[in-house]
Amino acid sequence: MPGENCVIIGAGGLGHIAIQCMKAMCAANIIVVEKAKAPLEHAMELGADHGVLIDGNEIEKVKELTKGKGAEAVIDFVGEKGSTPMGIKMTKATGTFYIVGYGEEIRVLAIDMIDQEKSIVGSLVGTWAELYELMELADKGLVKLSMKEYKLEEANKALHDLNDGKIKGRAVLVP
């Protein structure tokens, strides 16, 4: 909805696609939170309204961008290294935190969730209808996959580049 905010944590393999889908399908203000500059710059090129670099002040920056409230929706494509508690704190009262990335334990005080009426939703894959909708957006040129190819013997370099935030989008190993 116009005037609402959506935070996307992680602008990598899935996050960069989500930015484009959100831009094509809704009028929400898109705030991307990223640990590395290259993916954050790429997110801005893809249409994100705001970019926030993880530097220890990211929660305050998101609160500032959302007039002190937090976002109606926060989608965490990372799911590790503290992104989950960070994302829950960025979610406004009555908002929803969507967890897509996995690897981290979710620990929250029940009273915080109850008092603020926040929701947590896990998402592994979409429906066939959603996949069809994504393919239509791609066919119209509204969603494009960003990727960097590596030879199979460069797998370690690909992992290092991913970890260092040097890749815009997906890393793909080819034989």
Protein language model features and the residues they cover:
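Residues in the short beta-alpha loop(s) of Rossmann-like NAD(P)-binding domains
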Residues: K35-A36, G103, G126
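Residue-level detector of alpha-helix initiation sites
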Residues: G12-H16, K81-G82, E104
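Mid-domain Rossmann-like dinucleotide-binding core that forms the NAD(H)/NADP(H) cofactor-binding site
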Residues: M1-G56, K61
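Rossmann-fold dehydrogenase core element
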Residues: T96-Y98, V108-K148
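Helix-to-beta-strand junctions that scaffold the AdoMet/dcAdoMet cofactor pocket
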Residues: T91-A93
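C-terminal hydrophobic helical "lid"/dimerization subdomain
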Residues: A11, K37, A73, P85-K89, ...
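N-terminal Rossmann-like NAD(P) cofactor-binding module of classical short-chain dehydrogenase/reductase
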Residues: E72-I75, Y98
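A short acidic, Gly/Pro-enriched loop at the edge of an enzyme's catalytic core
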Residues: V62-A71
